[in-house]
Structure formats: C-alpha cells, structure tokens
Amino acid sequence: MEPTAAPHPHLYLASQSPRRQELLRQIGVRFELLLADGDEDAEALEAVLLGETPDDYVQRVCALKAQAAARRRAARGLPARPILTSDTTVCLGGEILGKPADAADAHRMLRGMSGREHRVLTAVTVVTADGTPMHALSVSQVRFAVLTDVDIARYIASGEPFGKAGAYGIQGRAAAFVAHISGSYSGIMGLPLFETAALLAQAAITL
C-alpha cells in the first residue's frame, strides 16, 4: 500500500514564538514556519514612532511583519499560501512595555504593574494567497496582585521575563501574579484564537 502523503500546511506562520505555534496547533491549524533571515532588522521594525498609541503601534508592527513575510516567501520561491503574523504589546497607562532590555528593566516593568491593571494588546494579520491582508485586534485587561521585591527578584531569576512583552508570560510562573483578567486568555499568551479563527474563515481556510 502506498504511504499517505502528509496534508499540505494551511498557512505560513511568520513567528518563532513557541506559544503561538502551540495555540495554532490547539485549533487544528497546520503551518510551515516562515522565519526571518539574519539580515532582517527586527529591532527597527518594532521601534515605537513618536506619539504613537499602543493600539496603533501593535497593529502597525503586525502589518509590517506580514509585509516582510510576504516578501520573504516570494524571494524564496515558496508556494503561494496564506501568511499569519501576530504582535503583542503590554501597556501601562499610555506607556508601551516592550521586551525588557535587562533585569533592571524587567524589575521596573513588574514593579509598575504591581497592584495595578494593565492592557495586553495582540494584533493578528492574515495575508491571503492572493496577497489580500486582513487584520484583527484583541484587547484584554489584566490586574496584578501586589508584588513584593522578593516576588519580583525570584521571577526575574527564573529567566522567564526575558523575550516577553511586559516582562512576563501568563502561561508560566507569572500566572501566580494575576488577580483578574478580562478579555482573551489566548490573546494575552500571544495569539487570540477567536479572532484568529474568524480571520482564517474569512480567508476560506477550513480547519
């Protein structure tokens, strides 16, 4: 008997985040990673523009990631399939909290969020196989318990804050800090599944 060929991926995922990969698998999406080359300047892509609001920022960066991924797919001569990108940012008041530069920066962010509510914004872009972009935005509110300096120091020592917007991951040890959330848990993790599934349906992707 001939072996059954593996089904084609539904889309390209232009993200190296293990959390986004896990969430896509959770809803049955088959994907192929479409990661950036070493010469692509991700830091320049994520720079905040003067006067930019957190909502505008996260949507602009997500759309730019999608444009870069589409160029990457074309340059590599890959088959035309939809592309999915996502970007998450945390904001406290009007301040955008990106990925911490170091332990001191992580401490500053966590201390600022202690006992307070902050917003987590995750933008999603799906570019269809014919190049049509579609966008969605998930906004959630998260309230932290009051954190002691010991709480913060232990969390930073775990290494978990680094590489994460707002210096924490809700799916990890920081779950113990979260007193209340309103919104999308998967969006806080990095990919809002309700909004993502709606975009995939618009792109005629059947899961």
From Swiss-Prot:
Subcellular location: Cytoplasm
Gene Ontology CC entries for this record: cytoplasm
Catalytic activity, reaction form: dTTP + H2O = dTMP + diphosphate + H(+); UTP + H2O = UMP + diphosphate + H(+)
Single GO MF descriptor: UTP diphosphatase activity
The protein's required cofactors: a divalent metal cation
GO biological process: nucleotide metabolic process
Swiss-Prot/TrEMBL site (Important for substrate specificity) positions: R19, T88, Q171
CDD domains registered for this protein in UniProt: Maf (cd00555)
Keywords in alphabetical order: Cytoplasm, Hydrolase, Nucleotide metabolism
Tree of life domain: Bacteria
Active-site residues (renumbered): D87
Pfam entry (one): Maf
Record's keyword annotation contains Zinc-finger: no
EC number from the UniProt entry: 3.6.1.9
Main localization category: cytoplasm
Family: Belongs to the Maf family. YhdE subfamily.
Chain's role: Nucleoside triphosphate pyrophosphatase that hydrolyzes dTTP and UTP. May have a dual role in cell division arrest and in preventing the incorporation of modified nucleotides into cellular nucleic acids.
Protein name stated in the entry: dTTP/UTP pyrophosphatase
